[in-house]
Regions:
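Substrate-binding pocket helix/loop in short-chain dehydrogenase/reductase
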Residues: 104-105, 109-114, 205
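Conserved glycine-rich Rossmann-like NAD(P)H-binding loop of the short-chain dehydrogenase/reductase
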Residues: 34-51
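Short, small/polar-rich loop/turn modules that mediate ligand/substrate recognition or access, typified
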Residues: 179, 184, 235-237
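Conserved glycine-rich cofactor-binding loop
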Residues: 13, 20-21
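Short C-terminal tail/terminal secondary-structure segment
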Residues: 2-5, 151, 204, 225, ...
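Active-site helix of classical SDR
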Residues: 128, 163, 171
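Alpha-helical segment proximal to the catalytic Tyr-Lys
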Residues: 133, 176-177, 233
Length: 248
């Protein structure tokens, strides 16, 4: 940003949903470092959103934050519209917002099921659809899924696994639909990643990972940035797992 060097995404406009903390914030930071003008949504972490905006702007980046509930169609569509009005037509869209609600299938409440599907699947579809409608040809769409789409690694994760597996189908279909416009659509499937939400579980999870460590947010962001770049123009419809061999 401020060092004067052109990054791999200089001149591009990106929108990241759920970008105020964790993996989402790491993606926002990395896209900005690579020269993109970045907008992101947040639902409740307003102070974290403001901090991230100040951080990126202090380093010379261009960033905007929009409050949006990913479960509300009009909020997502408004975020896409506001991004275009503020920064320009979209080149990159990252669907990152998601929730986790655990419960075994014999006890899981239907209300929780509906909310998980609404946020993790329906919102991803709505976001991809809205972004594609306003996106420049040759754009990039990246959905953040989970390695649980491959294997349910813990009891109570049935519905979460279901929602993340659904994203693999969404990406394959959207990749075909948008190929005539040279828009690529891919799915990044992180495994155990060190964030504020997972820090309490490191000692439990780390021994189960062949590389014997948690993933770093910066590693997820690096993969997303590559898929958003010109170099990844022939990759589409793919689900790429990044989990240190956890589901190998």
């Amino acid at each position: 940003m401020a060092d004067g060097k052109a990054g791999s995404l200089t001149g591009k406009v990106a929108l990241v949903t759920g970008g105020s903390r964790g993996i989402g914030a790491g993606i926002v930071r990395r896209l900005a470092v690579e020269g993109a003008s970045v907008a992101f949504t947040y639902s409740s972490s307003e102070e974290k959103a403001r901090q991230l905006v100040r951080e990126i702007e202090s380093e010379g980046g261009q960033v905007s934050a929009f409050k949006a509930d990913s479960g509300v169609v009009s909020d997502l569509e408004s975020a896409v519209r506001q991004t275009a009005e503020t920064l320009g037509p979209l080149d990159i869209f990252v669907s990152n917002a998601g929730i986790l609600s655990l419960g075994t299938i014999d006890t899981y409440r239907l209300e929780d099921f509906d909310r998980m599907v609404n946020i993790n699947v329906r919102a991803a579809f709505v976001g991809v659809q809205a972004a594609a409608r306003s996106m420049n040809n040759g754009g990039r769409i990246i959905v953040i899924g989970s390695n649980t789409a491959i294997r349910t690694a813990f009891p109570g994760g049935t519905v979460y696994t279901l929602t993340k597996a659904a994203l693999t189908g969404l990406v394959r279909g959207a990749a075909i639909d948008l190929a005539p416009r040279a828009i690529t659509v891919n799915n990044v499937q992180p495994g155990p990643t060190l964030t504020e939400m997972t820090s309490d579980h490191v000692d439990l999870v780390k021994p189960l990972i062949p590389l014997k460590r948690m993933g770093d947010v910066s590693e997820i962001a690096s993969l997303v940035t590559y898929l958003a770049s010109r170099d990844a123009g022939f990759i589409t419809g793919a689900s790429v797992t990044i989990d240190g061999g956890y589901v190998a």
